[in-house]
Amino acid sequence: MTQVTVGENEGIESALRRFKRQVSKAGIFADLKRLRHHETPVEKYKRKLQQRRRRR
């Protein structure tokens, strides 16, 4: 779960930017996209390949 605490002197815009960055790093949107639609075997293979590359 991604969580961002807003500091006392911090603006909402910067906190929102930090939140978006954390969400994209965690790959939450990619997971949602994957779960929303049917995934063909070729797409599954490509996704796993990307995950392997990302881990390196």
UniProtKB/Swiss-Prot annotation:
Gene3D superfamilies named in the record: Ribosomal protein S8 (1.20.5.1150)
InterPro entries: Ribosomal_bS21, Ribosomal_bS21_CS, Ribosomal_bS21_sf
Record-linked Pfam families: Ribosomal_S21
GO BP annotations listed: translation
MF annotations from Gene Ontology: structural constituent of ribosome
Disulfide links within the chain: none
Keywords on record: Ribonucleoprotein, Ribosomal protein
A GO CC term attached to the entry: ribosome
Family membership noted in the UniProt record: Belongs to the bacterial ribosomal protein bS21 family.
Protein name per Swiss-Prot or TrEMBL: Small ribosomal subunit protein bS21
Biological source species: Synechococcus sp. (strain RCC307)
Gene: rpsU
